[in-house]
Amino acid sequence: MAENDSWDADDFEAEDLNQKGAASGPVIVKDRWEGEDEEEDVKDNWDDEEEAQDATKQEPQKTELKVPEKKKLQEKIKEKENLQKKRKEELKKQALESSNLPEITPEEQLAEKLRQQKLQEDSDLELAKEAFGVNVPVTGIDAMNPSTREDFTEFGKLLKEKITQYERSLYYPGFLEALVRDVCLSLEVEDLKKINSSLTVLCFEKQKQEKQQTKTKKKKKGVVPGGGLKGNMKDYLEDYGGMDEGYGREFDDFM
């Protein structure tokens, strides 16, 4: 009976331990040293804080300031006004230079005035088209892309018309000199010789024309055809008494 009582006592203690363990909760088995889990949790929290700080730093970069459409339109209008003002000043300067040129006939003055007026109208029209966003197809010299001989011939005509409208300006000869020099920089020597020969021939032709005009002016200021007054008097006296004696000789001595 004693043995049975001891076994019963052992069973009783085991049961009591099991009941106490069940009441207090499951037993947690730790695979790591004490404090190791806590350090890992702390490191995880540090990573979370760093990520949060990076996110707060990156957020202001993503925000973009949007410029109001009204402000953009005002800036565009201001640019157009400045461009128009600049073009008007250039036209005014050209008109002043043209007015200072000597020996301009009234017809030439009227033609120059009409030309300046047309340039002003074209400038205003282009500004109005740009302001209202009107897309006009490009024509004329700006639309050309010459590739054949005929294309370059037509291109040259349009370019000549574009340039020669400023030929009355005081700066026109210097402009042409610089232009010809700049556009001929890439040419070969043989091509430059051909261009030089053409300009030399043109120079000789202009000199001949000037000499011819000078001779014509001198002839107009020369002696009147027929001998003038003296010739007419000689003819009259010759008819009256002859040139050898009489009034004819006296007239010669007097003259």
From Swiss-Prot:
Comp. bias regions, Basic and acidic residues: 54-95
Assigned protein family: Belongs to the eIF-3 subunit J family.
Any one Pfam family match given in the protein's UniProt record, by short name: eIF3_subunit
Compartments it resides in: Cytoplasm
TM annotation in the entry: none
UniProt GO MF annotations: translation initiation factor activity
Subunit structure as annotated in this protein's UniProt entry: Component of the eukaryotic translation initiation factor 3 (eIF-3) complex, which is composed of 13 subunits: eif3a, eif3b, eif3c, eif3d, eif3e, eif3f, eif3g, eif3h, eif3i, eif3j, eif3k, eif3l and eif3m.
Native species: Xenopus laevis
One cellular component term from this protein's GO annotations in UniProt: eukaryotic 48S preinitiation complex
Protein name: Eukaryotic translation initiation factor 3 subunit J
Sequence segments annotated as region (Disordered): 1-107
Coiled coil start-end: 69-131
Domain of life: Eukaryota
Keyword set includes Metal-binding: no
